[in-house]
């Protein structure tokens, strides 16, 4: 959706309520919402990515996806995670190869996952596979 995670305090409330109880998948603003609720700062990007396909690299921090592999992800966002971001439980698990912007997260202790890009987009290859891996985790 449009806006900044701080525009949606009730969503942050719901996230905190279900954090350790339910599997959570955040996509785009949901990804930003998770990071914001965990102390991350979400900022404006220099370039806006609406309807843009990026090459995204899977990092070694991922427990679900094969590290050093790449996917193509459909991006529709103007905000990003300000780094560095430190968390005891959340790892950034994918990055845009060109800009190094955080593109995915996995929580080590809770079943929380997120994508900055849109796995359901026609611009994303294997998006269905990404969601299926999370649902079966």
Can you describe what each PLM-predicted range is?
Residues 122-137:
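Acyltransferase
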Residues 8-12, 86, 127-128:
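Conserved strand-to-helix beginnings and helix N-cap segments that scaffold or border functional pockets
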């Amino acid at each position: 959706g449009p806006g900044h995670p701080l525009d949606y305090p009730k969503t942050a409330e719901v996230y905190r309520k279900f954090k350790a109880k339910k599997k959570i998948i955040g996509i785009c603003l949901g990804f930003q919402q998770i990071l914001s609720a965990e102390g991350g700062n979400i900022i404006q990007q220099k370039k806006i990515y609406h309807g843009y396909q990026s090459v995204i690299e899977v990092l070694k921090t991922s427990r679900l996806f094969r590290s050093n592999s790449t996917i193509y992800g459909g991006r529709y966002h103007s905000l990003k995670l300000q780094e560095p971001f430190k968390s005891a439980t959340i790892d950034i698990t994918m990055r845009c190869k060109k800009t190094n912007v955080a593109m995915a997260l996995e929580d080590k202790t809770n079943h929380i996952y997120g994508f900055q890009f849109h796995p359901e987009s026609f611009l994303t290859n294997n998006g269905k596979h990404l969601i299926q891996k999370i649902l079966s985790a």
